[in-house]
């Protein structure tokens, strides 16, 4: 499947990521069918999309007419057969459950043409182990980041049987939608960013649990150093600007010892146990004062 053959895109799953991903494809000019088995989930997705587009208009990022056109290009449906009718590209973003994803992949494989490209937003699961053998040449991982309508990165990983044409089409399509796809030559659990994030999580929870700083001070430190520098140099090029000899010396002579990784950090799970789940409940590490998710996003 080549880029010019793609006109209709199905986005399967309207949870946390689906609405923003659907918006991104629609902003690229494609007709999008957003599917979820749950009508309430679709109603919520519709509200999120309208709020997102209204924000773009209010911030002068889009004229009203263009925002209306983007919204009109998205169809909401709770019927999988309708979502897959005549599509050339399928973006899966259903629950992170192997049984659910495997079932969806099997249904998709049976309902779309052999040439249709299917990509997965799986984060903690290996999607290449769940997709039918018959689809593997036209299958890739396309891992987005929240909020997907804003953050440009999409990590695109190939499987052992992913065709060269499929990879090129996925990468080109994402660029056409204004995204920044980063190509991984093979799948690795966590892709790039989540692997780095796991290491950061270890330090974040260590610092919070030991009372070394507050969440606000930790975030301030990162925003005032790592993030602005990272926008320019990333993580690897920074070593070149520091000097590889200096970096090597710092590693050899440093007194820092990384804390042990915990799969149940108290700094996180204490909030979870109290039902403080972040913006979805109005409180997490920060207190959002009763503001809704739509107001905050």
Predicted regions: what they are:
Residues 1-55, 59, 111:
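NAD(P)+-binding Rossmann beta1-loop-alpha1 motif at the extreme N-terminus of oxidoreductases
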């Amino acid at each position: 499947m080549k880029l010019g053959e793609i006109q209709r895109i199905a986005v399967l799953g309207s949870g946390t990521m689906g609405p923003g991903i659907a918006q991104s494809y629609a902003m690229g000019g494609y007709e999008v069918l957003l599917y979820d088995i749950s009508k309430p989930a679709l109603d919520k997705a519709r509200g999120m999309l309208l709020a997102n587009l209204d924000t773009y208009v209010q911030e002068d990022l889009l004229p009203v007419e263009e925002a209306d056109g983007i919204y009109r290009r998205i169809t909401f449906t709770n019927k999988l057969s309708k979502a897959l009718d005549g599509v050339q590209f399928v973006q899966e973003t259903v629950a992170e459950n192997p049984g659910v994803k495997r079932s969806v992949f099997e249904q998709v494989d049976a309902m779309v043409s052999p040439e249709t490209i299917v990509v997965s937003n799986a984060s903690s699961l290996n999607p290449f182990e769940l997709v039918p053998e018959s689809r593997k040449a036209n299958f890739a991982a396309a891992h987005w980041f929240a909020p997907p309508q804003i953050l440009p990165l999409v990590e695109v990983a190939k499987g052992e049987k992913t065709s060269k044409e499929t990879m090129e089409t996925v990468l080109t399509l994402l660029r056409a939608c204004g995204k920044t796809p980063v190509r991984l030559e093979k799948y690795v659990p966590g892709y790039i960013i989540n692997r780095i994030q796991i290491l950061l999580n270890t330090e974040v929870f260590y610092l919070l649990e030991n009372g070394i700083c507050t969440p606000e001070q930790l975030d301030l430190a990162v925003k005032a150093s790592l993030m602005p520098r990272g926008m320019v140099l990333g993580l690897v090029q920074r070593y070149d600007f520091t000097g590889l000899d200096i970096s090597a010396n710092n590693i050899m002579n440093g007194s820092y010892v990384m804390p042990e990784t915990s799969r149940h950090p108290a700094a996180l799970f204490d909030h979870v146990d109290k039902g403080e789940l972040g913006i979805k409940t109005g409180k997490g590490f920060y207190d959002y004062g009763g503001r809704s998710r739509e107001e905050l996003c």
